[in-house]
């Protein structure tokens, strides 16, 4: 009904309706301009393939999926049983932190590629590793000296 009332004339006028310039207080600044497009060697040289590593490609993707799927029963079991066990808290904490680390590592790889940021890329990887270790230590302290991960989530959920 709406289409028949508006008709095709409204589609032609749609450019005028949506031609509003967005409000912006800053100009576009290219912080990291793109590198020059160059070819190493000649055009007739054979392509150099990178070294094959099991930490990249399909093995890495499969490991990420296994970690993500392993979290499902670890979250559901304490919810259905209503109780939490320290071993379940430890397993959930390890898989949750590993899942987060792998996700943030993908972000670091995407936004700070090693071929472009030769010094910043390793620094960002080490910052991520340090934050992951600090998170592991913090969750270990929370699980051993406090109420535990699943009880903490339950209290947050009910508050």
From Swiss-Prot:
GO biological process: mitochondrial electron transport, succinate to ubiquinone; protein insertion into mitochondrial inner membrane; tricarboxylic acid cycle
One Pfam match: CybS
One GO MF term attached to the UniProt entry: ubiquinone binding
Induction per the UniProt record: Expression is down-regulated under conditions of iron depletion.
One GO location term (cellular component): mitochondrion
Annotated residues for binding of a ubiquinone: 111
Topological domains, Mitochondrial intermembrane: 83-89, 141-159
Membrane topology term: Multi-pass membrane protein
Positions annotated to bind heme: 99
Transit peptide region: 1-30
Keywords attached to this entry: Electron transport, Heme, Iron, Membrane, Metal-binding, Mitochondrion, Mitochondrion inner membrane, Transit peptide, Transmembrane, Transmembrane helix, Transport, Tricarboxylic acid cycle
Side Mitochondrial matrix, residues: 31-65, 110-122
Subcellular location: Mitochondrion inner membrane
Family to which this protein belongs: Belongs to the CybS family.
Complex formation: Forms part of complex II containing four subunits: a flavoprotein (FP), an iron-sulfur protein (IP) and a cytochrome b composed of a large and a small subunit.
Name the UniProt record assigns to this protein: Succinate dehydrogenase [ubiquinone] cytochrome b small subunit, mitochondrial
Upper taxonomic lineage: Eukaryota, Fungi, Dikarya, Ascomycota, Taphrinomycotina
Gene from which this protein is expressed: sdh4
């Amino acid at each position: 009904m709406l289409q028949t009332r508006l008709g095709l004339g409204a589609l032609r006028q749609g450019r005028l309706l949506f031609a509003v310039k967005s409000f912006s207080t800053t100009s576009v600044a290219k912080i990291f301009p793109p590198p020059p497009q160059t070819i190493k060697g000649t055009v007739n040289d054979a392509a150099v393939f990178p070294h094959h590593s099991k930490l990249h490609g399909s093995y890495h993707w499969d490991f990420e999926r296994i970690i993500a799927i392993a979290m499902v029963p670890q979250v559901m079991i304490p919810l259905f049983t209503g109780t939490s066990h320290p071993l379940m808290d430890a397993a959930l904490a390890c898989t949750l932190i590993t899942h987060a680390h792998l996700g943030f590592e993908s972000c670091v790889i995407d936004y700070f590629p090693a071929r472009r940021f030769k010094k910043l890329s390793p620094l960002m990887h080490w910052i991520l590793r340090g934050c992951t270790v600090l998170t592991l230590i913090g969750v270990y302290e929370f699980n051993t000296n406090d109420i535990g991960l699943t009880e903490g989530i339950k209290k947050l959920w009910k508050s």
